[in-house]
Curated annotation (Swiss-Prot):
Protein name: Alpha-hemoglobin-stabilizing protein
Functional description taken from the UniProt entry: Acts as a chaperone to prevent the harmful aggregation of alpha-hemoglobin during normal erythroid cell development. Specifically protects free alpha-hemoglobin from precipitation. It is predicted to modulate pathological states of alpha-hemoglobin excess such as beta-thalassemia.
Tissue and organ expression note: Expressed in blood and bone marrow.
InterPro entries: A_Hb_stabilising_prot (IPR015317), AHSP_sf (IPR036468)
Organism of provenance: Homo sapiens
Family note: Belongs to the AHSP family.
Amino acid sequence: MALLKANKDLISAGLKEFSVLLNQQVFNDPLVSEEDMVTVVEDWMNFYINYYRQQVTGEPQERDKALQELRQELNTLANPFLAKYRDFLKSHELPSHPPPSS
């Protein structure tokens, strides 16, 4: 079943907005754990899903398919963001072993 044009347009708009949200994030102190950042991103995704749930059109199957596609696409955008955050955390880790004294 193909998505309705109106739903495709909503998904496209949602992805653009979500991408802007992710690109606006500045990583700085205080740092949050990777797990907490995953929770934050999942909360953002749920917010977008709930917002667009009220706007998608069509039969229940068409609406469900549109929301499923939106969730998959949001995940696709979130994964590189979370990888970037993971790398940021690694670059700010304190050494686990003190440097050898001379």
